[in-house]
Swiss-Prot record:
It comes from the Bacteria. InterPro entries: DUF2207, YciQ-like_C. It comes from Escherichia coli (strain K12). The lineage of its organism: Bacteria, Pseudomonadati, Pseudomonadota, Gammaproteobacteria, Enterobacterales. GO terms for cellular component: plasma membrane. This is Uncharacterized protein YciQ.
């Protein structure tokens, strides 16, 4: 008996101590900064609008609360069926101790922040009663014959403790407690703890203080109580991304513009006869390495520029000095009387000489940004531009149209929703420029790849569907990772499809436009014939069977054309043994000198061309929620 009596006394003492500790824990210490009471009064209007008054009692100690605070509210909430309800807010006003307080809105991906206070005014230490009055549309859920409200009262992202929370819900035209079900959930997101109690009048209040935990309530009532309210509007993420609505059809106009532009260019396409590549062993005297680069490789770049300069070195119009101790090379113009080669230069060669040595007879190559090479490179590009325009029909204009169309879609999609944050603009531009367009063009190249082992139908399937499949996988992975803060929820319906389709049409339209004019076809066939001739010359230096009349020695005079045909490395490795031992090999024929020259010229033309380069909160368990903090 004595043992039982002692156990009863210990139990009574424990209950007494726990009650005292509970009473102490619900009181915020005087030195601590936090929220002593978070009291929310919610009223459902007959039209379904949820009117909310948040009475937040702060104890400010100038630790985090220096000017005021901010209240984060989610812009949507994910329903149990996977659809999303977009929340529309209307801020009625904010008061501090009954006096209107300045506030403004900040928008973030997934959140709307009400920033309360003035950054020009310092808030003294003290206890303050703030009231935020706002209204929310599309906040409840309809399930069969009943309506349901799941509301995260406080949110779970406050940086300090909330010592007491109260929530009450009532109808504006109905008195009493008409609810068929009331429940609450506390803890972290997804937890079902019960740190609170439900009172007889339908109110809910917390028991213990909580930190970074949500306080979610659930109310259910018969549908007849809100029979005049419009049905809640929900959207499915896939239909929202893929299909435009009546109000968002404008976002698909750039796609229509691209289709019309492509049909216009296709209708004006040149009708030409294909030209076969024939064998040749002669390079025309009026032909330059830069022309070969443009005709056979379809571009005049730093290699074509290097090939033109090497051709002048071979002709003796420019002397190359390689100073290995200083890791630099010098181009020196040779006077007319100092060379035995008095051949008349072609207009392109004469222009290059004048561009290089406009201010002197020397150009020092150090591998850095070189303005002389930059200007010479641009002048040569301008010289070859008429030849390029007469050869190619596939104009870059269509790519410019596509870029403008993509930009129009992205800007319209980001500027149309309320509260543009800019994050989706940055994300869309990054995805489009760094992933979708490069991947699209790489897959399109498969369609025209010269690989007899792969059937054409397989390449067509890969070209048409691989970018779309990978875009879908990328979107799904993003959706799984970011969930309800996925910024595409807030874009107009069909925005994601419009972005991808615009980029897809740009790539597809450009690649299927005819590449050459009739003149371009002839020049391309001629350039390919010369490239094949140079490749045969290089292959003849290997041990093996040779054609009749071919020699194992490479012609030093063809070095410029070899560079233009991407054969410069092979020729440089074999050109020194090909020269007669009785003849002193020119400086450029030594192994390594040509590679260094190409590097210097490429840096001077290409690096300067590009300029400088550089390497380089959600709701917990329903609508409402977010969080807040001091500032």
């Amino acid at each position: 008996m004595a043992g039982k009596f002692r156990c009863i006394l210990l139990l009574i003492a424990g209950l007494f101590v726990s009650s005292l500790s509970y009473a102490e824990n619900t009181e915020i210490p005087s030195y601590e900064e936090g929220i002593s009471l978070f009291d929310v009064e919610a009223t459902l209007q007959p039209d379904g609008v949820l009117d909310i008054k948040e009475n937040i009692h702060f104890q400010a100690r100038n630790q985090q609360i220096k000017h005021g605070f901010y209240r984060d509210l989610p812009r949507l909430w994910m329903q149990p069926d996977g659809d999303a309800a977009l929340l529309n807010y209307h801020i009625v006003g904010v008061t501090r101790d009954g006096i209107p307080e300045p506030w403004h809105l900040d928008w973030h991906i997934g959140l709307m922040s009400i920033v309360v206070g003035d950054k020009q005014r310092f808030l003294p230490q003290g206890d303050y009663h703030y009231q935020i009055h706002y209204q929310v549309k599309n906040a409840f859920l309809r399930e069969g014959d009943s309506d349901l409200l799941i509301w995260n009262v406080t949110g779970n992202h406050w940086p300090f403790e909330i010592y007491k929370t109260r929530f009450s819900l009532q109808f504006s035209n109905i008195a009493g407690n008409p609810f068929s079900e009331i429940d609450l959930f506390t803890g972290e997101e997804g937890d079902t703890y019960r740190n609170g109690r439900i009172l007889e009048d339908g109110r809910i209040e917390s028991r213990d203080p909580f930190y970074r935990e949500d306080f979610t309530v659930l109310y259910r009532w018969p549908h007849a109580l809100l029979s005049n309210a419009s049905a809640p509007q929900t959207t499915n993420i896939f239909s929202h991304l893929l299909l435009p609505s009546t109000s968002s059809l404008l976002i698909w106009f750039p796609c229509l513009f691209l289709v019309c532009g492509w049909l216009y260019l296709w209708k004006r396409r040149p009708q030409f006869t294909p030209v076969d590549v024939i064998e040749t062993d002669v390079i025309p005297p009026d032909y330059t390495p830069g022309m070969l680069r443009l005709d056979a490789k379809l571009v005049y770049d730093d290699k074509g520029f290097c090939a033109d300069i090497v051709n002048l070195i071979v002709k003796g119009k420019i002397h190359l000095e390689d100073q290995s101790d200083k890791n630099q090379q010098i181009l020196i113009r040779v006077n007319e009387g100092a060379t035995r080669n008095n051949a008349v230069l072609l207009p392109a060669e004469q222009l290059l000489l004048e561009a290089l040595f406009r201010k002197g007879d020397k150009v020092v190559l150090t591998g850095r940004r070189n303005r002389v090479l930059r200007r010479a490179f641009l002048r040569m590009q301008k010289f070859y531009l008429p030849r390029k325009k007469s050869s190619f029909y596939r104009s870059d204009t269509f790519l410019q149209w596509g870029g403008l169309a993509i930009l129009a879609v992205i800007l319209y999609g980001n500027l149309s929703p309320v509260g543009w944050a800019g994050m989706s603009l940055v994300g869309d531009m990054f995805i489009m420029i760094c992933w979708i367009i490069p991947f699209l063009f790489c897959s399109l190249e498969l369609l025209f790849a010269r690989d007899d082992d792969k059937p054409c139908v397989n390449r067509v399937i890969i070209t048409l569907f691989l970018p779309l499949i990978c875009s879908g996988v990328a979107f799904y992975s993003l959706y799984i990772n970011v969930g309800d803060v996925f910024f595409y929820w807030y874009m107009p319906a069909g925005y994601f499809t419009a972005v991808c389709l615009t980029g897809y049409l740009t790539g597809m339209g450009y690649i299927f436009l005819p590449k050459f004019t009739q003149t371009g076809q002839q020049r391309y066939a001629h350039g390919e014939a010369i490239v094949n001739y140079l490749a045969r010359k290089e292959a003849a230096t290997h041990s093996g069977r040779r054609r009749k009349g071919e020699t194992r020695k490479l012609d030093y005079a063809l070095l410029g054309w070899a560079i233009s045909a991407n054969l410069g490395r092979e020729w440089a490795l074999r050109i020194a043994p090909s020269l007669s031992s009785a003849i002193r090999a020119p400086e450029i024929a030594r192994n390594g000198v040509l590679f260094s020259l190409q590097t210097h010229l490429s840096c001077g033309a290409n690096t300067s061309l590009l300029g400088r380069s550089y390497s380089g909160g959600g709701a917990g368990g329903g609508a409402g929620g977010g969080g807040g903090g001091g500032w």
